[in-house]
Amino acid sequence: MFLATFKLCAGSSYRHMRNMKGLRHQAVLAIGQELNWRALGDSSPGWMGQVRRRSSLLGSQLEATLYSDQELSYIQQGEVAMQKALGILNNQEGWKKESQQENGDEVLSKMVPDVGKVFRLEVVVDQPMDRLYEELVDRMEAMGEWNPNVKEIKVLQRIGKDTVITHELAAAAAGNLVGPRDFVSVRCTKRRGSTCVLAGMATHFGEMPEQSGVIRAEHGPTCMVLHPLAGSPSKTKLTWLLSIDLKGWLPKTIINQVLSQTQIEFANHLRKRLEASPASEAQC
């Protein structure tokens, strides 16, 4: 009896030790799910409520792949960025209109504690959601071909199917008053129901140090939300939350002008790209 009990305990201990890494991943997942439910709450309106009800965005399903500690950290950073960005969008109070175009595109802004001034672009694009996803995610590195505000985007590392580390080199703006900037960011992509969320924020990547002659700026929690326009599923409602610390000394009036104009120009260039470039088999 004693020998049988000993073998049972020893076998259980061996299996426990062998599965410790998997258990750690499960713990990360469980904590993420709990944080996300608390952050988003039960009173989320519209598409935000749909995202929350379908599944926890922060508690994503980690693949069977065993990630390193650094990779797990990047995954968590991306999901935290998504949580924070969606939390900002979910708060409807305090938004002020920066600009509105004749086609209905508008930019709003507000001050967010511990983040600073954020900008919110609201547009409707006459293309299905999967087409936008293809251009903004699958063809991310080609953005410099159609968006003159971006010189280059390069994927530095892919982690699973949802997370990437990127380096972005932005062009000078405002008649060279704002010199070239670059960004190193972690980006996370999720779909829940008919809504796609693309989120990100600044991170550190040892293999991409600061570049000579370029100021290393930082994205705060930022995201794009894509979902079919109500009543017109062939069109897409795009909401872009932009939060950036450009670094260096710049007047606030210049910063506000550059960021709001950047969003308007992005929408215009995106439409032209979608009209000119054929779609492939893409699905968000």
Swiss-Prot record:
The pathway that the record names for this protein is: Steroid metabolism; cholesterol metabolism
Question: Transit peptide boundaries, per UniProt?
Answer: 1-62
Q: Which GO terms describe its biological process?
A: bile acid biosynthetic process; biphenyl metabolic process; cellular response to alkaloid; cellular response to antibiotic; cellular response to cadmium ion; cellular response to cAMP; cellular response to dexamethasone stimulus; cellular response to epinephrine stimulus
> GO molecular-function annotation terms?
cholesterol binding; cholesterol transfer activity
> Which residue ranges does the record assign to the START domain?
66-279
PANTHER family, A to Z: STEROIDOGENIC ACUTE REGULATORY PROTEIN, MITOCHONDRIAL
Name of this protein: Steroidogenic acute regulatory protein, mitochondrial
The species this protein was found in? Mus musculus
